Design a protein with these regions (language model features):
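Short, small-residue-biased leader/transition segments that mark boundaries at the very start
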Residues: 2-9
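Extended beta-strand/beta-hairpin segments
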Residues: 10, 16-28, 86, 102
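Iron-sulfur (Fe-S) cluster-binding segments and ferredoxin-like electron-carrier domains
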Residues: 28, 68-80, 105-106
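A generic alpha-helix surface/boundary motif
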Residues: 29-34, 50, 66-68
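Helix-loop "lid/cap" segments that line or gate small-molecule binding pockets
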Residues: 35-39, 72
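Short amphipathic alpha-helical boundary/capping segments
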Residues: 39-45
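Short, thiol/selenol-centered motifs that function as redox-active sites or metal-ligating centers
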Residues: 52, 56-68
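C-terminal structural segments of small proteins and small subunits
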Residues: 84-109
Length: 111
């Protein structure tokens, strides 16, 4: 360690951050309820929410998320062209790394 303090490095060499406690089953259940409410159709319909979820999965580079939301999108009848448009928005906001992630994920899914 160089002794330079940054957000990613501990202040002292012998100081390690404490491990976060594991979430309780009640907390996980509440999070599951939140996820269900967030993805349920409302003022924004299910198709739009899945396209948003696809774009956010690309921005966050979350491959399991992208796989899940692509499957849900295709089940709703969303076309590859619509998914590509959502991906283009993700790339607009997240740049080249998002484009590379999307292309690689789609290549793997076609294999």
């Amino acid at each position: 360690m160089t002794g330079v303090q940054t957000c990613a490095l501990p202040i002292f060499e012998d100081h390690a951050p404490a491990a976060a406690p594991a979430p309780s089953s009640a907390a996980l259940a509440r999070f599951g309820e939140f996820m269900g409410a967030a993805t349920a159709p409302g003022k924004v319909n299910a198709r739009a929410k899945e396209l948003i979820a696809v774009a956010l999965s690309i921005v966050r580079h979350c491959e399991p998320c992208l796989r899940s939301h692509l499957a849900a999108a295709f089940a709703l009848g969303i076309t590859r062209e619509e998914i590509d448009e959502a991906a283009a928005l993700a790339v607009e906001f997240a740049g080249c790394p998002a484009l590379m992630f999307y292309k690689e994920t789609m290549r793997v899914l076609r294999a």
